[in-house]
C-alpha cells in the first residue's frame, strides 16, 4: 500500500491506494450493459489496461445509449463487439470464439435485465450467448434502482446465478442517479478491479 498525499490551504487530504497487479497474461472479456452506471466501466477498463490485461468488450444494445464503441475501443485498445449476427464475422462464430478466448468475464454494470437473462439461460443477444457458452469465471457488478434490487424476482435470479458459481461485486448503498438512496449502486472501479 502507498499514500497519495495532497496538501492545500484547506488541510490534509490523503488517499490510500492498493498496489496494482501485473495482468500481462490475463484476457478479460468485459460486458457492458445498458444502465446509467455504464460510464463507470470506462474507468474500470482503464485500470485493467494500465495493468497490462488484454481486453475485448461486448456492448449490449442498450449500453450504446450510455457509452460509445469508439470510447471503449480507444481505452481498451481492442475490438468492441455488439452484434450476435455480424455479417463481417459470420464465419467466426463470435460467441464461441469470445467464450474460448477469455480467461474471465466481467459484467459491469450488470442490470436487472441481464441478471434475469443469465439466470434463465437466455441467449438472445451476444452478451448472454457468450456467457452461456463459456465455462470461465463470471463476475457481475450489479447496478439498478433500489426497488429493482430488492424485488423478489431479482433475489431469486441472484440465488440461481450464485448456484452457477457466478461471483458478485456489490452493489453498494448510496445516492442513485434517479434521486433515491439505497442499495443497488454499482461498486467502485477499484473494487471491481481488485476482485
Predicted regions and their residues:
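Cysteine-centered motifs
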Residues: 8-10
Amino acid at each position: 500500500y502507498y499514500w497519495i498525499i495532497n496538501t492545500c490551504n484547506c488541510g490534509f487530504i490523503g488517499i490510500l491506494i492498493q498496489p496494482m497487479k501485473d495482468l500481462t497474461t490475463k484476457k478479460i472479456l468485459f460486458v457492458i450493459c445498458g444502465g446509467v452506471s455504464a460510464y463507470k466501466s470506462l474507468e474500470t477498463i482503464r485500470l485493467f489496461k494500465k495493468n497490462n490485461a488484454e481486453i475485448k468488450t461486448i456492448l449490449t444494445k442498450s449500453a450504446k445509449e450510455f457509452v460509445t464503441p469508439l470510447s471503449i475501443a480507444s481505452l481498451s485498445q481492442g475490438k468492441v463487439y455488439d452484434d450476435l449476427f455480424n455479417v463481417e464475422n459470420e464465419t467466426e462464430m463470435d460467441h464461441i470464439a469470445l467464450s474460448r478466448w477469455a480467461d474471465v468475464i466481467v459484467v459491469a454494470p450488470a442490470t436487472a435485465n441481464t441478471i434475469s437473462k443469465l439466470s434463465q439461460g437466455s441467449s438472445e443477444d451476444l452478451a448472454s450467448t457468450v456467457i452461456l457458452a463459456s465455462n470461465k469465471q463470471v463476475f457481475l457488478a450489479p447496478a439498478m434502482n433500489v426497488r429493482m434490487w430488492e424485488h423478489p424476482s431479482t433475489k431469486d435470479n441472484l440465488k440461481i446465478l450464485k448456484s452457477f458459481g457466478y461471483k458478485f461485486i456489490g452493489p453498494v448503498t448510496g445516492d442513485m442517479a434517479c434521486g433515491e438512496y439505497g442499495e443497488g449502486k454499482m461498486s467502485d472501479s477499484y473494487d471491481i478491479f481488485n476482485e
